[in-house]
């Protein structure tokens, strides 16, 4: 049977007080609905039906290039009505898994357990036990077997005492699901077509109904307002921090890091507070990351150090290299083994060779820097002529004095020395000393200007 996933994402989310459709609000820098879509892909779904309504243009702008079947729910008439809009895309032999675009923390392992709990041609529903089930549909059982789900507003006094609640997530056989959806009625307190009513229909038809539960109730919580969104964010971050610690990272304070992507760490990694990881980040063994650092789509080699408040984006930091504090590696930058950039050094589309150093206040862009090079404070590779970018090549063992400008395209030969304050516009041969600074003048008898009285 093919796995066909239906994701309900048509709601406006009025309580968010936002023009953005609710499901596009982010958890860990990714929209809630994208989390759910990614989970569906990880399950091996053969098709994903996205039921949408409010904010269609914004949804399609964000998600439109993905392999989704877009299903319009023009009127929001309940969850049963929403799923029914996808009937034409559901095969009789499909296993249909129903998920929610505002429930982003559901785990693949939980859904695998739900699918495994389902009997052939049976219905499986995900439930959870809550100390306070107020507001949720209750699971009604007879002799231990599920016979139906009753919504809060339709429940009697005895049913309101039930702590096992419906999460809304279920797996059903395609043929029977379409038949049950066709029998739904809106004759209830809400005047809506409840998806939950199909459970009683399944029981009446003698269909096997099984249940599964998540490891944690937070997996099935949704976000209807920004307070709940923040709570889900914290839960996501706590889970991410726990994963990093289990992989071998020491977190100075697990409550004060932000993971916004896929992070892989080696052993004995030390991560200080308020560090942000975004995109795909790979960190080797014995790495130290200082407070306030931001790492985006980058690779950090063994024994490297990222000092406080440095930004590493689409860059590579090699083994035993270091950056910061207050350093910035922009896309295409690479520090080779044992290289170092210090405070207020920026690199872009440039390589700093093994053992080379730029200690402070420098810009290195569109450059190839060899091994054993020292770049003095205030050095700039002048890579842009107003129309095009040009390359600066600095070969091994070059000494660049402070406040030097290298006007690209230019090549500095091996072992050359550039005097402080020089502006280099032509290639420099190996082992040459080049000084271009203006001759110093001494003017005697000079008087400073005096401020005029107003």
Curated annotation (Swiss-Prot):
Keyword terms of this UniProt record: Acyltransferase, Cell shape, Cell wall biogenesis/degradation, Cytoplasm, Magnesium, Metal-binding, Multifunctional enzyme, Nucleotidyltransferase, Peptidoglycan synthesis, Repeat, Transferase
Alphabetical list of SUPFAM superfamilies matching this protein: Nucleotide-diphospho-sugar transferases, Trimeric LpxA-like enzymes
One of the record's GO cellular component terms: membrane
MF annotations from Gene Ontology: glucosamine-1-phosphate N-acetyltransferase activity; magnesium ion binding; UDP-N-acetylglucosamine diphosphorylase activity
Gene Ontology biological-process entries: cell morphogenesis; cell wall organization; lipid A biosynthetic process; peptidoglycan biosynthetic process; regulation of cell shape; UDP-N-acetylglucosamine biosynthetic process
Renumbered residue ranges of the record's region N-acetyltransferase: 248-454
UniProt KW Phosphoprotein keyword: no
Source domain of life: Bacteria
Chain sites annotated for binding UDP-N-acetyl-alpha-D-glucosamine: 8-11, 22, 73, 78-79, 100-102, 137, 151, 166, 224, 330, 348, 363, 374
Binding of acetyl-CoA, residues: 377, 383-384, 402, 420, 437
Location(s), subcellular: Cytoplasm
Residue segments, region Pyrophosphorylase: 1-226
Reaction(s) this enzyme catalyzes, per UniProt: alpha-D-glucosamine 1-phosphate + acetyl-CoA = N-acetyl-alpha-D-glucosamine 1-phosphate + CoA + H(+); N-acetyl-alpha-D-glucosamine 1-phosphate + UTP + H(+) = UDP-N-acetyl-alpha-D-glucosamine + diphosphate
Catalytic residues of the enzyme: 360
Subunit structure: Homotrimer.
Family, per entry: In the N-terminal section; belongs to the N-acetylglucosamine-1-phosphate uridyltransferase family.
Protein name from the UniProt record: Bifunctional protein GlmU
Natural source organism: Shewanella loihica (strain ATCC BAA-1088 / PV-4)
Gene giving rise to this polypeptide: glmU
